[in-house]
């Protein structure tokens, strides 16, 4: 599961 927003992944 992805427990973060796109901002954290970018």
From Swiss-Prot:
Glycosylated. Keywords: Apoptosis, Disulfide bond, Glycoprotein, Plant defense, Toxin. GO terms for molecular function: toxin activity. One of its GO terms (biological process) is defense response. It comes from the Eukaryota. The keyword Glycoprotein applies. Heterodimer of an A chain and a B chain; disulfide-linked. Significantly inhibits growth and induces an apoptotic response in HeLa cells through cell-cycle arrest at S-phase. Exhibits highly cytotoxic activities against cancer cell and non-cancer cell lines producing IC(50) values of 0.15 nM for human cervical carcinoma cells (HeLa), 7.71 nM for rat pheochromocytoma-12 cells (PC-12), 11.20 nM for human breast cancer cells (MCF-7), 15.80 nM for human leukemia cells (K562), 2.79 nM for African green monkey kidney cells (Vero) and 3.92 nM for normal Madin-Darby canine kidney cells (MDCK). This is Malanin chain B. It comes from Malania oleifera (Garlic-fruit tree).
């Amino acid at each position: 599961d992805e427990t973060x927003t796109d901002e954290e992944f970018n």
